[in-house]
Amino acid sequence: MTIDIKDISEKDRNTVLHPFTQLKDFATGKLREPTIVETGKGIRIQDARGNQLIDGFAGLYCVNVGYGRTEVAEAISRQAYRLAYYHSYAAHTTDELAILSDRLVKMAPGKMSKVFYGMSGSDANETQAKLVWYYNNLRGKPTKKKIISRERGYHGCSVVSGSMTGMSFYHDHMDLPLPQICHTGVPHHYWGANPGETEREFSARRAAELDEMIETLGPDNVGAFIAEPVLGTGGITPPPEGYWEAIQAVLKKHDVLLIADEVITGFGRTGSMFGSQHYGIEPDLITVAKGLTSAYFPLSASIVGEKVYKVLEDGADRVGAFSHGYTYSGHPIGAAAANAVLDIVEKEDLPGNAREVGGYFQAQLKEKFAQLPIVGEVRGVGLMGAIEFVGDRENKKRFDPLLKVGARVSKAARDRGLIARAMPHGDILGFAPPLVTTKEEVDEIVAMAEKAVRSVMDELVRDGQKL
C-alpha cells in the first residue's frame, strides 16, 4: 500500500496527542517529522520512506515473539469472525478466556488462584491497588491501605499506577502521587552503595530502610509493596545480590502483600518464564501485560494468589458482588491473541532463547563497552540490558544533563538503523530486543550501538569535553 507521507504527517501533527512528547516542539515542527511505521518482520520494522530499523527495544519491551507472526494474526482473525466481542460480567465467558486463565494460573509462580483482565499494565496495577484495599477491608483492617513502591520503579501512568511510579516527572503538574502511595530507596548498587559496601550489605540496608518505613507508617497502615523483579524504565537495573530475600523477610514480618509487576519481565524476558522465578520471589499478586499478547492486541492481567482470593470469596456473602470490571475485561480477541502468543513462547522456548542468546548479548555488551571512558556500568539480564554513561568514570560523576549524552547516543544509533532507548533517568542506553533475536542479530545490534557510542565520544572530544 502506498500512502501520502505528507498528508499522513499533517493529519498526525494536527490531530494526535502523542504520549511523552514535547507538545509545542512537535506542533511547531521543531521535533522531527512523525515516523510513520508501516510494516514489521522479525526484529525489524520499516517506515513509510522505506527505511529499515532493527527494533532493539521490542516496541516498548513488548513484541516478544517478533513482528509479522501470521499464526497470531490468524488467531485474531478467526476469533473476530467467530465472536468479535462479549463481556465477562456475571459469569459470562468464552473458550479462549477460560483456556488462557487456566494456563496463566498454572504457569505463574507461587500459589495463584484467579485472573482478572484489563487492557494495559497501568490499569492492571490500578486493579491490584483496589484488590489490596478490598482484601484488607474484608479482613477487618480498614487502615491497612498504604502501598509502598520504589524510587525509579515504573508501574504505569494512570492515577494510582502513576503514583506508584517512582519518577517525579510522572507526577509533576499532575497532582500526583496520591497520599496512599509511598516510595522507598532504589536498589541500584552502582549509585546507591556506600564505599566498600558489598551487594549483600547494600541489599540488607535497603531492606532495613523498608522495615523502618513500615514501622514509621505503622504496620497496620501498610497493605502492600509493589516492585518489578528487574527495574525497567528506571534504568534496566537487575537487583543486587540478596535483595529479594531480604525484602521478602520484611514483608512477611509485617503482613504486607507483595505485588510483582511482571509487565516487562513476564513470559521469558529474563531467561525464566517470570522474573519472580528468576529471583526466588513469592508474590501474592502478579501484574502482566506487554508480552502476554506480544502487543498484537491490548490485554493485561492481574493474577490473584490463593491467600488473597480466599478472603475475597469468603467475604462475598457479606458484601455482595465483586464490583470492579471493564467493558473489555477478558476480551475474546485478546484472549485468542494471548493463547497464540503463549503457544509460540512454549513451542519455541523463548525463555530458553533469552537465556542462551541473552547470555551472549550480556557478554558482548560488556566486551565492547565496559572499558570505554564514558561508560560507568554495563548491566542486564537475559534479553534486557543497559549502558550507563558517566562524565567522570573514576569518581562516578554524571555528565552535565544539558549535554544529553544518552539521548545523543540513542539518536546516533537510530541514524545507523538501530532503535535503542534513551532511558528517562540519567544517561542510559537501554536494550530489550524481541525474544526471538538470534546471536547474529545481537552482533548487528552491538555493532551499531558501538558505532553510535564512539561517534558521540568523538563529538564530546571535539566540543572540548575531557573523557
UniProtKB/Swiss-Prot annotation:
One of its GO terms (molecular function) is transaminase activity. Its EC number is 2.6.1.-. This is Uncharacterized aminotransferase y4uB. Disulfide bonds: none annotated. It comes from the Bacteria. PANTHER family: AMINOTRANSFERASE, AMINOTRANSFERASE CLASS-III. The modification N6-(pyridoxal phosphate)lysine is found at residue 290. It comes from Sinorhizobium fredii (strain NBRC 101917 / NGR234). Belongs to the class-III pyridoxal-phosphate-dependent aminotransferase family. CDD domains: OAT_like. NCBIfam families: PRK06105.1, PRK07482.1. Signal peptide: none annotated.
